[in-house]
UniProtKB/Swiss-Prot annotation:
One Pfam family matching this protein: Carboxyl_trans
InterPro entries for this protein: AcCoA_carboxyl_beta, Acetyl_CoA_COase_Trfase_b_su, ClpP/crotonase-like_dom_sf, COA_CT_N, Znf-ACC
Reactions mediated catalytically: N(6)-carboxybiotinyl-L-lysyl-[protein] + acetyl-CoA = N(6)-biotinyl-L-lysyl-[protein] + malonyl-CoA
Quaternary assembly: Acetyl-CoA carboxylase is a heterohexamer composed of biotin carboxyl carrier protein (AccB), biotin carboxylase (AccC) and two subunits each of ACCase subunit alpha (AccA) and ACCase subunit beta (AccD).
Organism ancestry: Bacteria, Pseudomonadati, Pseudomonadota, Gammaproteobacteria, Pseudomonadales
Pathway field: Lipid metabolism; malonyl-CoA biosynthesis; malonyl-CoA from acetyl-CoA: step 1/1
EC number: 2.1.3.15
GO CC entries: acetate CoA-transferase complex
GO molecular function, one term: carboxyl- or carbamoyltransferase activity
Role noted for this protein: Component of the acetyl coenzyme A carboxylase (ACC) complex. Biotin carboxylase (BC) catalyzes the carboxylation of biotin on its carrier protein (BCCP) and then the CO(2) group is transferred by the transcarboxylase to acetyl-CoA to form malonyl-CoA.
Domain of life from the UniProt record: Bacteria
Gene3D superfamilies reported in the protein's UniProt record: 2-enoyl-CoA Hydratase, Chain A, domain 1
Annotated GO biological process: fatty acid biosynthetic process; malonyl-CoA biosynthetic process
Protein name: Acetyl-coenzyme A carboxylase carboxyl transferase subunit beta
């Protein structure tokens, strides 16, 4: 019996454990909506939209810009800008430590990435919030990058598109972060005066100071399916008004029904749909592939 254990069973267990450890991490992903277990390479083909239930999963800012902009001619804007802890703010942690941790986790300097490029051959400027960086909160660098992107759109007289995913203003920057609401709104007013289109795409989630400023100031406001959009969260509102909120409250479908946004577009259709829309705005020839 002892020989059988040593010669057969133990080597078999060791081989099995070795095979388990050789499976790459992150190869499978569970849908947070329907809990289907999905093969990661196949999920990437659907742009992180569940093929079983059509749930639009959160994606990072660079991935979003990669799938939206043409491959050629991209130029990142404001990449040299880095956040500074001017107030020496501290809550349960020092702000500078939170920044360092977020930068290490995401590989980004702050919560907004801006790029000039092309959309099906049409010059555009696009921005995307990185929700994984301190909840996509808007501080001085986010505001400055957005303004620089808008200024490039003004100089080139081309459309500006912003993909919002944010919890709101960054509390660690206090009044400096609140000032970004006015700063971004002011530059969007200049775009409107010049007749340059701004398309705001609301992804899951958009709250607080971002929803109360740039996110809701688009000439066209687009929502991704079932994105949460509001100022305060539904639980906070329920506790305040002490009433049960309507079914689907703050979902993009609810906002569309009540006239707060203009359309809901599936992620896979967003690129050609916006290309057609912007060609109409700018009186450019419609893209052939659209």
């Amino acid at each position: 019996m002892s020989n059988w254990l040593v010669d057969k069973l133990i080597p078999s267990i060791m081989r099995s454990e070795s095979q388990k450890s050789s499976v790459p991490e992150g190869l499978w992903h569970k849908c947070p909506s329907c809990e289907a277990v999905l093969y990661r390479p196949e999920l990437e083909k659907t742009l992180d939209v569940c093929p079983k239930c059509d749930h639009h999963m959160r994606i990072n800012a660079r991935t979003r810009l990669d799938i939206f902009l043409d491959e050629e001619g991209r130029e990142e804007l404001g990449a040299d800008l880095e956040p500074v802890d001017r107030l020496k703010f501290r809550d349960s942690k020092k702000y500078k430590d939170r920044l360092s941790a977020a930068q290490k986790d995401t590989g980004e300097k702050d919560a907004l990435i801006a790029m000039s490029g092309k959309l099906e051959g049409m010059p555009v400027v696009a921005c995307a919030f990185e929700f994984s960086f301190m909840g996509g909160s808007m501080g001085a660098i986010v505001g400055e990058r957005f303004v620089r992107a808008a200024n490039v759109a003004l100089e080139q007289r081309c459309p500006l598109i912003c993909f919002s995913a944010s919890g709101g203003a960054r509390m660690q920057e206090a009044l400096i972060s609140l000032m970004q609401m006015a700063k971004t709104s002011a530059v969007l007013a200049r775009l409107r005066e010049e007749g340059i289109p701004f398309v705001s795409v609301l992804t899951d989630p958009v709250y607080g100071g971002v929803s109360a400023s740039l996110a809701m100031l688009g000439d066209v406001i687009v929502g991704e399916p079932k994105a949460l959009i509001g100022f305060a969260g539904p639980r906070v509102i329920e506790q305040t008004v002490r009433e049960k909120l309507p079914e689907g409250f703050q979902r993009s479908e609810f906002l569309l029904e009540h006239g707060a946004i203009d359309m809901i577009v599936h992620r896979g259709e967003l690129r050609p749909r916006l290309a057609r829309l912007l060609s109409a705005f700018t009186h450019s020839p419609s893209p052939v592939s659209a």
